């Protein structure tokens, strides 16, 4: 019964034991004491002593509970003790085992069990002192390579852990005094194995090694080499205490015996160091000497043999009681969560084998998954000893929703608001308020469109510049009733067609004037009249009308129509009607030259328009004799002359004579040219127009018939020679034929000529709008040389009673002048300078009519001829 009770109590205590944490709760100090003649205070040089605080509370700790202090990067405890008690006030509350890591694990540990001294109403606190050395590598094993990067020279933080409680302190480690480029030697004692780890690295070759042989031998020393523990590799770096931090394979050949190990290698790249290490057993000797083989050839250098010997001090194992015991290391898988090292009970008197057992937890693999949620969950799939358990970690993640808003700042901000209770977080994006935009459309010379956006800083105004190719333009000329010209431009949207509408004055309402001619009987006279002008005009056309017959004014019945027909090379048909009480007559124009004689024709492109009341006034615009341009209703040629003939209608005739001067026609034949010459003085203020390449025209306009009631022409109005006028279109500057620099070239815009005939005391103004057809007039050479470009028209003064008169022509050149400017029609009475020499054998001269320098008609009344007669008597 008693035995059953004891067994039951043991089972209950085991079943109720638990793992507690947080017993070691403070890192009070960490100091170093030189345990030998070490030249520097390195982490692997003994002895480092840590003072750790602990506390046990009976409320949470019970007998049999366990707790552990893990000490990462600690190599071994520097003591012969295998355990230590936690004592307070002379009482032991826990017993702890000292588990050195050595080459087995990356950490040492202190594992403790609460004793029965601890009761529920007891609380104990105290400190424990632990001597040890740190592990910073020293071989090619996985444990040493991991620990080779635990610390660096200088200030470091050392941290120990008791479950989820961590305690830390800082420490200052000194760097090795051996140059890293020199050969490196190391021997470390493994107390639990009574062995030493020997490491060798040859000198550094900065550019790499071509070949070499490295190794060591224990021949003659009694020490043996464990070939199963040999590591060979190359490292791409050393830590501050000259231990390899990595191990990579390379091309080598290894030879190992119980007394020596040799490694021959080739082609080690730059930046790498070859090394070899092995466990050495050195028992029953106080010291032993090692022979090191060190032969190497650096890249680009000759082979070097730097082999040497070195003596290491050994020690005797005091635990076995006898030397030469066998130490067996076994590994056993347990269900614990940490790895532990334990020594099985050993009696040196009876046991020859000391067993060190490594308790390794069941290996586990961790699988991390994720889900939309808030908390992290863990689940473990257990496995029996010898298999691998699985730990599944389910990590939550949140989805996000983005909210964008505007603000007055100048930058974009993004803020994530994490929801602690839900899986949806909010991302708030604040963007600057948009700038206002101004769009400008402009035209440029390219054939394609572009859009440029200029973004201003926040708070400014953005600009969008649209560049469009230019629209095509269609120009239309229209005629209207106003007396002035206008130009209207209609700009279409991009891609359309712009329109330019030019409205010019239509001459359908040409005005007329009334004049009564008186017949004066005056003797033959010869004289000159000079009228000085005070106003200059831009254009000058001089014509003289002489030897007008006596006639009386009478109305002429004209159809109410106004039709101007474009002409061909040989003829012109003109019907002019009466509007607003104005009367018109049809006029036939005769052109004469020495080669072809006189023909009733008009050059192509010319327009004849006439208006009259009691006195018939004919205005002829002559242009484009070579047929290069066509005129239409209301248009004028860019070059030409304007002549005005005034006559009084007489008895109508039923037929237009086709052969002037033939018997029975009533029209005298053309007289022979007069030898008298008309001269023109220079007009002050007249424009100096350069010579042009246009041929002047000699033009004679003959009024020899009237218009009947139905528009047909009648018989000649008088038997006297026809009214003859002549206008020089162009002439060379200061030439004999154009000394006054006068020209008849049209320079205005296209349109009809509006002739305003004022009373006899006023001046009628003829304004010739220009056109843009660029027509050129071809003249006749009246000197008998035929057609000649560049000749100046000759004024033919036809004398009365078959009195001859002739003026030879002079050749000159010039250019046509044309423009599209519009000139208005204006009636102004201004005296002009006009030098005119008149020679006549007629006794009766009713009236003379001339163009002044500005193109106005000057009608001289009867009293002027009386004055001329008186002057001729005196002279």
UniProtKB/Swiss-Prot annotation:
Q: Which GO terms describe its biological process?
A: cell adhesion involved in multi-species biofilm formation; cell adhesion involved in single-species biofilm formation; cell-cell adhesion; hyphal growth; single-species biofilm formation on inanimate substrate
- Which coarse location class applies to the principal site listed for this UniProt protein? membrane
Which residues are assigned to the propeptide feature?
853-875
Membrane-protein topology: Lipid-anchor; GPI-anchor
User: Span of the secretion signal?
Assistant: 1-17
Q: Where is the composition biased (Low complexity)?
A: 549-578, 627-641, 722-746, 789-816, 827-837
Q: How is it modified after translation?
A: N-glycosylated and O-glycosylated.
Q: Where in the cell is it found?
A: Cell membrane; Secreted, Cell wall
Q: Which GO CC terms are listed, alphabetically?
A: cell surface; extracellular vesicle; hyphal cell wall; plasma membrane; side of membrane; yeast-form cell wall
| Keywords of this entry | Cell adhesion, Cell membrane, Cell wall, Disulfide bond, Glycoprotein, GPI-anchor, Lipoprotein, Membrane, Repeat, Secreted, Signal, Virulence
Q: Which sites carry lipid of kind GPI-anchor amidated aspartate?
A: 852
Q: Which residues are sugar-modified?
A: 542, 626, 789, 811
Query: Where is composition skewed (Polar residues) in this entry?
Result: 674-715, 755-764
What are the start and end residues of each ALS repeat? 365-396, 401-432, 438-469, 474-502
Q: Which family does it belong to?
A: Belongs to the ALS family.
Q: What name has this protein been given in UniProt?
A: Agglutinin-like protein 4
């Amino acid at each position: 019964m008693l035995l059953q009770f004891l067994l039951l109590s043991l089972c209950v205590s085991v079943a109720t034991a638990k793992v507690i944490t947080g017993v070691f709760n403070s890192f009070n100090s960490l100091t170093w004491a030189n345990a030998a003649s070490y030249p520097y205070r390195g982490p692997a040089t003994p002895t480092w002593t840590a003072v750790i605080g602990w506390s046990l509370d009976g409320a949470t700790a019970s007998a049999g509970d366990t707790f552990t202090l893990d000490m990462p990067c600690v190599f071994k405890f520097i003591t012969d003790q295998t355990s230590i008690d936690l004592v307070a006030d002379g009482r032991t509350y826990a017993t702890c085992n000292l588990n050195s890591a050595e080459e087995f694990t990356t950490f040492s540990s202190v594992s403790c069990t609460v004793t029965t001294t601890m009761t529920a109403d007891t609380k104990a606190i105290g400190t424990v002192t632990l001597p040890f050395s740190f592990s910073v590598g020293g071989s090619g094993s996985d444990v040493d390579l991991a620990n080779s990067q635990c610390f660096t020279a200088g200030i470091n933080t050392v941290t120990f852990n008791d479950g989820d409680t961590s305690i830390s302190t800082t420490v200052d480690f000194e760097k090795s005094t051996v140059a890293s480029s020199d050969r490196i030697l190391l021997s470390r004692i493994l107390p639990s194995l009574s062995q030493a780890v020997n490491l060798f690295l040859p000198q550094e070759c900065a550019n790499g090694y071509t070949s070499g042989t490295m190794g060591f031998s224990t021949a003659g020393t009694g020490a043996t080499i464990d070939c199963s523990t040999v590591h060979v590799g190359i490292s791409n770096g050393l830590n501050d205490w000259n231990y390899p931090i990595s191990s990579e394979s390379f091309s080598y050949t290894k030879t190992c015996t119980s007394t020596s190990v040799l490694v021959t290698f080739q082609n080690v790249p730059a930046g790498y160091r070859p090394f070899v290490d092995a466990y050495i057993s050195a028992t029953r000797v106080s010291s032993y000497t090692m022979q090191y083989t060190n032969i190497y050839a650096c890249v680009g250098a000759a082979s070097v043999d730097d082999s040497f010997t070195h003596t290491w001090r050994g020690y005797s194992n005091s635990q076995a009681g006898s030397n030469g015991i066998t130490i067996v290391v076994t590994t056993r898988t347990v269900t614990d969560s940490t790895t532990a090292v334990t020594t099985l009970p050993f009696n040196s008197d009876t046991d020859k084998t000391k067993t060190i057992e490594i308790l390794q937890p069941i290996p586990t693999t961790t699988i991390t998954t994720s889900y939309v949620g808030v908390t992290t969950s863990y689940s473990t799939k257990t496995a029996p000893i010898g298999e691998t358990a699985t730990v599944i970690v389910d990590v939550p993640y949140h989805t996000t929703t983005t909210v964008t808003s505007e603000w007055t700042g100048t930058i974009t901000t993004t803020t994530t608001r994490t929801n602690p209770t839900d899986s949806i977080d909010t991302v708030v994006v604040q963007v600057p308020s948009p700038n206002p935009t101004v769009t400008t459309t402009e035209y440029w010379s390219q054939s394609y469109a572009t859009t440029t956006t200029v973004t201003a800083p926040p708070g400014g105004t953005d600009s969008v510049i649209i560049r469009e190719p230019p629209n095509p333009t269609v120009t239309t000329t229209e005629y209207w009733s106003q007396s002035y010209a206008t130009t209207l431009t209609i700009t279409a949207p991009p891609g359309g067609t712009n329109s330019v509408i030019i409205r010019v004055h239509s001459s359908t309402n040409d005005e007329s004037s009334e004049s009564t001619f008186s017949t004066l009987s005056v003797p033959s006279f010869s004289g000159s009249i000079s009228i000085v002008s005070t106003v200059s005009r831009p254009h000058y056309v001089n014509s003289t009308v002489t030897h007008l017959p006596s006639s009386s004014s009478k109305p002429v019945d004209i159809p109410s129509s106004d039709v101007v027909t474009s002409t061909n090379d040989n003829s012109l048909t003109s019907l002019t009607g009466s509007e607003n009480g104005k009367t018109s007559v049809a006029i036939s124009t005769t052109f004469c030259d020495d080669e072809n004689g006189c023909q009733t024709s008009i050059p192509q492109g010319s327009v004849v328009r006439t208006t009259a009341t009691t006195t018939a006034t004919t205005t002829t615009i002559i242009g484009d004799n070579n047929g290069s341009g066509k005129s239409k209703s209301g248009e004028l040629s860019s070059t030409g002359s304007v002549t005005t003939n005034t006559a009084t209608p007489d008895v109508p005739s039923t037929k237009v004579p086709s052969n002037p001067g033939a018997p029975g026609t009533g029209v005298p034949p053309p007289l022979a040219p007069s030898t008298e010459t008309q001269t023109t003085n220079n007009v002050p203020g007249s424009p100096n127009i350069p010579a042009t390449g246009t041929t002047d025209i000699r033009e004679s306009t003959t009024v020899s018939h009237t218009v009947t009631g139905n528009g047909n022409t009648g018989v000649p109005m008088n038997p006297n020679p026809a009214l003859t006028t002549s206008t020089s279109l162009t002439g060379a500057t200061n030439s004999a034929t154009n000394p006054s620099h006068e020209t008849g070239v049209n320079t205005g815009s296209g349109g009809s000529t509006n002739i305003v005939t004022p009373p006899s005391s006023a001046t009628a103004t003829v304004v010739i709008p220009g056109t843009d057809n660029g027509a050129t007039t071809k003249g006749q050479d009246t000197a008998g040389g035929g057609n000649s470009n560049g000749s100046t028209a000759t004024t033919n003064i036809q004398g009365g009673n078959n009195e001859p008169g002739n003026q030879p022509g002079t050749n000159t050149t010039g250019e046509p002048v044309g423009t599209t400017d519009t000139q208005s029609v204006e009636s102004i009475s201004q005296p002009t300078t006009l030098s005119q020499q008149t020679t006549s054998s007629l006794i009766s001269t009713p009236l003379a009519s001339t163009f002044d320098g500005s193109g106005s008609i000057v009608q001289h009344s009867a009293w002027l001829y009386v004055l001329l007669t008186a002057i001729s008597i005196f002279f």
